[in-house]
Design a protein with these regions (language model features):
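C-terminal structural segments of small proteins and small subunits
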Residues: 82-100
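Conserved short "hinge" loops at termini or chain/domain junctions
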Residues: 1-68, 101-119
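Mid-chain, well-packed structural core segment of small domains
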Residues: 59-84
């Protein structure tokens, strides 16, 4: 299994364990029993998680945090379907603001492990 496949599997498990798909569907006003758009929504959730990880946000360690969840959902709402361009622009602006807050907050950063440390 390649690193990318392993990472995708890990993210998909995270999505299932935390009910992010269910939450995203609820926020998009899609009934939970409908599965027609699940692949698209899951892809967007995965993209949001990867974007957060790209800027060194510890998503896995803070996945239950409402700011992290909100940031993921805003990303999904900004990129889902072909909705109102003004709303999409507003969601993207909010996403970038949240991303910046998470990126520069020490609390949400991945902890670096010093391999040279004595313990």
């Amino acid at each position: 299994m390649t690193y990318e496949e392993l990472k995708t599997t890990e993210i998909n498990q995270l999505i299932v364990q935390t009910d992010l798909l269910k939450l995203a569907k609820e926020c998009l006003s899609i009934v939970d029993s409908s599965t027609m758009k699940d692949k698209e929504i899951t892809m967007l959730i995965e993209s949001a998680i990867r974007d957060l990880e790209r800027v060194e946000v510890d998503v896995k360690g803070h996945i239950e945090d409402n700011l992290v969840k909100n940031t993921i959902i805003i990303y999904v709402k900004a990129h889902f379907g072909d909705g109102d361009i003004d709303k999409r622009t507003e969601y993207l602006k909010r996403y970038k603001n949240n991303l910046r807050e998470l990126q520069f907050s020490e609390e949400y950063q991945k902890k670096e492990v010093d391999s040279n440390a004595w313990c």
